């Protein structure tokens, strides 16, 4: 939710992210957005009836809950690739391992990875120190240029939009367990990556200063 009144902290973080989004693509400094979501795992207790002409597939109202899985979305909007990592939990340790995967597997040749994410409490360099010895934690901290969306401004994180695409195209049905979820998400991810699906961010700082003028402190 966008704040209803002037909020200097919000506009400062918003303009920081918008400045990042206005930069030209630099392969040595790739832009990567990160966000998380969860998926309730639900198994069918009876075999669903398949769809027929004029009639959708039917599922029994009884089902079995199999817990919740977490999904970390890494999205490079200017390069058109994404990677979704499925985990059992959503902790500082899980987050730290995702960042190491991003650094060493997906962007090993980058001089610096420009990282945009929301202000969740685990999205901090401290998480790396919880997960790894200090020299490794420091190495990883310095691999990133850290940027945060403002509080109540997660819509500025392009990974959130990509999670919405994942939810509508892949997760809008019952999925029984983590293994099936990981398989389905990987298939979706590979299809999107094959087509280099990018994000074309349009909202700029100049537009924000007009359309969201009420959020800016006013001066005589």
Give the residues covered by each predicted segment:
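C-terminal domain-tail junction helix/linker
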Residues: 3-9, 45, 180-220
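Extended, low-complexity cationic-aromatic segments
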Residues: 13-100, 212
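A short acidic (Asp/Glu
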Residues: 42-44, 124-129
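RNase H-like polynucleotidyl transferase catalytic core
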Residues: 58-64, 136-158, 173-176
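Short, basic/hydrophobic alpha-helical segments
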Residues: 93-114
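Acidic/histidine-rich, metal-coordinating catalytic segments
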Residues: 110-124
């Amino acid at each position: 939710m966008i704040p209803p009144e002037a909020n200097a902290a919000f506009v400062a973080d918003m303009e920081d992210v918008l400045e990042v989004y206005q930069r030209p693509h630099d392969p040595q400094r790739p832009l990567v957005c990160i966000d998380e979501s969860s998926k309730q795992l639900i198994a069918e207790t009876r075999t669903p009836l398949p769809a027929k002409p004029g009639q959708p597939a039917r599922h029994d109202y009884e089902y079995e809950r199999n817990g919740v899985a977490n999904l970390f979305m890494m999205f490079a909007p200017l390069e058109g690739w994404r990677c979704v990592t499925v985990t059992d939990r959503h902790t500082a340790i899980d987050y730290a391992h995702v960042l190491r995967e991003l650094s060493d597997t997906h962007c090993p040749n980058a001089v610096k990875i420009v990282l945009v994410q929301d202000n969740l409490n685990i999205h901090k360099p401290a998480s790396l120190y919880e997960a790894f010895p200090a020299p490794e934690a420091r190495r990883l901290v310095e691999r990133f240029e850290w940027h945060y969306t403002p509080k109540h401004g997660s819509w500025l994180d392009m990974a959130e939009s990509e999670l919405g695409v994942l939810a509508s195209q892949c997760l809008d049905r019952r999925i029984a367990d983590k293994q099936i979820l990981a398989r389905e998400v990987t298939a979706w991810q590979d299809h999107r990556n094959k087509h280099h699906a990018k994000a074309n961010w349009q909202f700029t700082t100049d537009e924000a200063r007009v359309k969201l003028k009420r959020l800016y402190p006013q001066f005589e």
